[in-house]
Amino acid sequence: KILATSLLIEAFLYEEQTRRGISLKHFDEFNDVADHCTVCHKCLTPCPVDIDFGDVSISMRNFLRKQGKKKFNPGSYAAMLFLNATDPTTIKIIRKTMIEWGYAGQRLGYQLAKRFGLIGSQTRNPPATVGKPPLKAQVIHMINKPMPGHLPKKTSRALLGLEDPAIVPVIRNPARLNEDSEAVFYFPGCGSERLFGQVGLATQAMLFHLGAQTVLPPGYLCCGYPQTSAGNDDKGQAITTANRVLFHRVANTLNYLDIKTVIVSCGTCMDQLLKYQFDKIFPGCRLLDIHEYLMEKGLKLDGVTGTRYMYHDPCHTPIKTYNPLKVANDLLGGGVKLSDRCCGESGTLAVTRPDISTQVRSRKQEEIIKVAAEINQETASTENPKIKLLTSCPSCLQGLSRYNDDTGIEADYIVVEMAKHLLGSTWMEDYIASANNGGIERVLL
């Protein structure tokens, strides 16, 4: 990709210097190279010339947008519409149409394509992804792995009645509140709040269980990372600046709470929030993933029988203070195996370039099957365990859920799995009832 980009730049320079006029076909190739990147930055480590192609890809996308040559993509447009929305009614409408009905339609398409044998050859031996595939192939790429079902009907904020952007919610457990109760600021992000609301609720429920005072941001907020990585740097910067100003206002309003920890439950949010200079908003604070926080507090699952766990460490891992696999093992009682490789979802990649996603998923599926076979081999003599694939990223949760049909392995979030075992199978209903029964203080911003 580095060579391809260098050659394209050279072609631009050559045509400009020889006054032949610049061929617009170069922009198509530029788009294609820029699309082949999940912005995970993992290619920097082995790169012999220290080029971070994630940053280069973002620059290429910004260049194409500014030149008016970035190709319109309906999938990307729809995803950004959902992420940029802050009005509760707009979010509700988009969730109903795009997520609920759209996902159901995609799953129906998958079932039909599977029945007529249209998927097998494409997923077994994914075709090359240079240039745009034909329309029929694109459609099959889009439906060759089913979207997850059984999503919460409402967002986590809607379930708690906290959609007013003029209110700062402070959630605390009155039964466990004392002078030493720690105050934390929890930034749920889009994935844990709008899409997989159970993740945001499980995070809050565990903090509630620990007796922490949890401060939530007012209203629906996106961190700005998806916009920046998609090549819309202006929008990403605008969101980041607006959020930082808002958080300063929150800090001033709640200056009587000594907030020393900012909690996230999403890796891309963590990457973006590291740029927010939180030490100037809440002096002396640190950024932690919810799983790191729970590990520090000594929470763990003991004696879970009949289930073995695999852990998928996201490309944008939110666990940056400790070793991710160690955190997973500590929380889940040991015996957790790492499932390597990218899941292929990568935020909006799966809807913008499903052909590239198909290639990535092919390799990931091999890895899941291999690790599952290792677990079955280890436990063959004693038990036949149920295997679960856990992660710590909402986008990865969606991506990993799509392998369920082919591998029979269920995907979930570590914090959700912990909530089920530590707080009971009705943890969500119990938490919502407790929070709504005197557990929420609504502070006017």
What is each model feature region?
Residues K1-H36, P48, D55, N62-K69, ...:
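Ferredoxin-type iron-sulfur electron-transfer modules and their immediate structural context
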Residues Q17, H26-F27, C40, F187, ...:
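General secondary-structure edge motif
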Residues D55-L445:
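Iron-sulfur cluster-binding electron-transfer modules in prokaryotic oxidoreductases
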